Amino acid sequence: MNKIYNNLSIENLIKTDWFEQFKLYQKEEILEGLKDNLDVSIYANPEYKWSQMSEIRKGLQDNLNVSIYAKTYFNRAQMKEIRLGLKNNLNVSVYATARFNEYQMKEIREGLENNENISIYLKSRFNEYQIIEIKKGLKKKLNVSVYANKKLSGYKMREIRKGLENNVDVSIYAKPYFNKKQMREIRCGLEDNLDVSIYAKSDVYWKQMEQIRLKLLKEKNQ
């Protein structure tokens, strides 16, 4: 924002050609900032969407170091997660990077707020679904290293986490080559103390696994 325009009154500013380059909602964000005596030059940039401007303006209202997230490559939701982290005095540097989407940022921010060992899910660039499962395991003090594997989807991680919660030998099915439904059938069999070795094979379709498991369970209960 040109210093000449910065010194104009709001009434005169809205009459300038400079102000006319902005769209309606962008103009509203600039005017809101001026009314609150904020340094709108930080976000008075036509490259910002109005929603991005709004997040920067909110940060300025709270006297936050908005320079950390006042970047055009962060979308509104990413900016919000960084702003909330700054507001709570968190070390946002660990997630204030474009390589994390807003959902990943949210999970990392909440992990910092809860004093979790976020290093476990930061180093391998897990997606938000994987991070959620790792966080659930950490919260229950499980050995998450068993399933904190980038090759395992969030759904597969969930099956392994449930097995750990029920104290079964998850090593039998904690393999990337089993799909989530196969893992579920093996886990359910282990929880019922069945001999899952009969069907715990990657070439056995999950529906076949289910049929074998139910047959074994029926025989056991006779």
Predicted regions and their residues:
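General marker for long, soluble alpha-helical cores
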Residues: M1-Q222
